[in-house]
Amino acid sequence: MYRLKKLLYKILPTSWYLACMQRGFFLLFDLGILKRDARFKFHYAAKKLLTETDVVVDIGANLGYFSKLFARKITQGKLYAFEPIPDFHRRLSIILRPFPNTELVHAALGAEAGILPMVMPVQSGVLRTGLPHIISEEEARNHAAVQRVKVLEAKEFFSQLPKLDYVKCDIEGYEWKVFSTLEIELQRLRPVVQIEISERFIEEFCAFFNRMGYVQCGLYEGQLVQENGTQRETSDFLFVPQEKLDHIFATFNR
């Protein structure tokens, strides 16, 4: 697979390469071929974690591998998908077009509004589509290919939501910048939160959600389980409000 990606990235324009990656993922996903790959266990679990009327926010929607699955499920709900990179945003707009209950936002979320530098890493001749990330201005001076992206204030956006059931966040090390500003809104809205956490922030996040009455959970051998700090399987973290725990466990593990 790696050699194929390297060849495609070498011979195709970036937009075509991204289209191939996107279409290839959903073909393999829908055929069930990715079920045995632990990297995609939350993708297959999404339909069991959501209901048709849920309001979902996808922070760092990327190529839409989660966004499209969310949109398929929440037919009577609402999806807000945030993606600041122009090439990725274009691909997202195509695959989410059939879903009128989605709102695609061409921006990142951050602690404050503004413009920040972002990079898309190319490693060993392959564009790492899952690793674009915001960098500092000092780091930007040492990168040849930097994109300036729009950032909206996360707290301001969340404060406008009357209802929120689920948040997915994958923003490659920038997650604490966002969530450290959201305690008041998370307390008000009480969504389930699925988040990829950089190792250096695990302790802060666990304490943060514990303080708000959330329970740390994860997926282990196909089941939803309670976790404590480092997880049994490397994957996203799932934080569930204590008052929703019994219902989610009963629904997921039946």
Locate each region found by the language model:
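Phosphate/nucleotide-binding beta-alpha loop and adjacent structural elements of enzyme active sites
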Residues: 1-254
